[in-house]
Amino acid sequence: MEPPSAEELGRFWHEDMIWYGPAPIGATYTIPRYIKQHTGPFRRGLGGKTFHGHKVRFAEGNFACFFGWPNLSNRNIGGFLGLPAGGTADMQVVDVYCRRGDKLSENWVLIDIPWWLKQQGLDVFQRTSEILNPAE
């Protein structure tokens, strides 16, 4: 699935938008970089997406938030976060948006990446424990 075009996103986002993603994904500034650095890899590396809906939605002033546990299931078809193809996994996601005028200007996205990686067979906490506390 190809990412949306800059024109499509420009209907809802300011050109100088900022997207703050979790550590392995990073942050992006401007619509073209958002497409290149996040939306493109996310759509090309993950297939079979199933949205489970939002469990909570709330807003106040210029801010809105939603989350779901899980909110999205997908299949790692290879390349996402540098990983080879893997199985289906759930993503636990929190999205917080800020609006400036009639368009979105910022988006903070929290994804429980360690949980997603564990479902792909990589337990980063166990691996870190093994590195820091090697068996004698």
What residue spans do the PLM features occupy?
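C-terminal and inter-domain tail/linker signature
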Residues: 1-136
